[in-house]
């Protein structure tokens, strides 16, 4: 049996018991931040701990059955104990694979909600229209999965679509579903204004951020520079007579977040802080992955925005994902939210990459 899995199972059970004991101590309610941290970790570890306990029990049963074989008084008895050992070993092997999938191969951010930042790239008006198409595609896919979604901020383009739109998607495992959408999406189609029928190529970029909770990313108010101004619509015209739009600059990193989608300044500030926390969490993830030598997995998993990941060819009605070499010829259905074929293929590639990294001893 894989000693790595045995060691991990024992550590998982021990840690889960520690967390259970801590949650049962009334004193923890005096520190709400600590309570939230422990409760979140306890919930996240529950399935892994249950699998680990069943795995260790199966190993114990296999060992005990094998120990009884030499003392058996008949061939039938020896075969019975051998059969018991084989059955327990088979269960242990199956559980080991589940543990590997749950605890080794799994991204710790998979259970989180997600923030998608969609921006028009090269291609002018067509890029803005394509950014709008991507937003509609993700919104419809979220609806199909029963996830909630809402626009946190948007900069509409005059011709339609968006120069930028930031969307929050809430649901169990939302990040695991959308995390592979990060990167540059390319569209090839004939613009409505093109009289010669020439195909134009445009791009839009998507950044995928696991939504950070307050307990994960602490922000010092002294590190923030907050400006307020009037909201504006397409073309820059004012759509609000009060200074409700908010721009927050995080001075230590230089990150800037603007939000003008809500009607009140307070709501826009809260939304901007949520986006800022998620960007800071993503930044921390990337820095950690770089330190651990995981840039290949990092770019695949969290979305290297410079990488062209997918091409949408309207004249041929096809979509190609360049990371897994998958081409489908139902472009309209995919833009209508039927993304499952891509998300399943990308999740399978991630699992294979993580397993390969684990087998070679690389961090993963």
From Swiss-Prot:
InterPro entries: PCRF, Pep_chain_release_fac_I, Pep_chain_release_fac_I_sf, Prokaryotic/Mito_RF, RF-1
Transmembrane intervals: none
One Gene Ontology MF term: translation release factor activity, codon specific
Entry GO CC: cytoplasm
N5-methylglutamine: residues bearing it: 237
Major subcellular site: cytoplasm
PANTHER family to which the protein is assigned, alphabetical: LD18447P
Record protein name field: Peptide chain release factor 1
């Amino acid at each position: 049996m894989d000693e790595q899995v045995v060691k991990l199972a024992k550590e998982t059970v021990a840690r889960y018991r520690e967390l259970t004991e801590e949650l049962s101590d009334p004193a923890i309610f005096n520190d709400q931040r600590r309570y939230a941290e422990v409760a979140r970790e306890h919930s996240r570890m529950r399935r892994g701990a249950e699998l680990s306990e069943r795995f260790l029990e199966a190993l114990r049963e296999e060992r005990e059955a094998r120990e009884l074989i030499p003392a058996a008084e008949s061939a039938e008895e020896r075969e019975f104990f051998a059969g018991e050992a084989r059955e327990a070993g088979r269960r242990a092997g199956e559980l080991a694979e589940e543990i590997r999938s749950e605890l080794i191969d799994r991204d710790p951010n998979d259970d989180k909600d997600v923030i998608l930042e969609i921006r028009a790239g090269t291609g002018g008006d067509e890029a803005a229209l394509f950014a709008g198409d991507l937003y509609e595609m993700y919104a419809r896919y979220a609806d199909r999965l029963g996830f909630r979604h809402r626009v946190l901020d948007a900069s509409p383009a005059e011709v339609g679509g968006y120069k930028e739109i930031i969307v929050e998607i809430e649901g169990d495992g939302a990040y695991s579903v959308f995390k592979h959408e990060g990167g540059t999406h390319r569209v090839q189609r004939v613009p409505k204004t093109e009289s010669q029928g020439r195909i134009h190529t445009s791009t839009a970029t998507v950044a995928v951020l696991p939504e950070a909770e307050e307990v994960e990313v602490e922000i010092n108010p002294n590190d923030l520079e907050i400006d307020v101004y009037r909201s504006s619509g397409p073309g820059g015209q004012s759509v609000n007579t009060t200074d409700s739009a908010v721009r927050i600059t995080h001075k230590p990193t230089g990150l800037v977040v603007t939000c003008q989608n809500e009607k009140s300044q307070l709501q826009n500030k809260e939304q901007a802080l949520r986006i800022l926390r998620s960007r800071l969490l993503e930044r921390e993830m990337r820095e950690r992955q770089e330190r651990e030598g995981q840039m290949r997995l990092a770019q695949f998993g969290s979305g290297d925005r410079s990488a062209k990941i997918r091409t949408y060819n309207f004249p041929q009605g096809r979509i190609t994902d360049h990371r897994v070499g998958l081409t489908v010829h139902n472009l309209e259905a995919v833009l209508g939210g039927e993304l499952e074929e891509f998300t399943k293929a990308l999740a399978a590639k991630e699992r294979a990459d993580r397993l390969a990294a684990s087998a070679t001893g690389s961090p993963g």
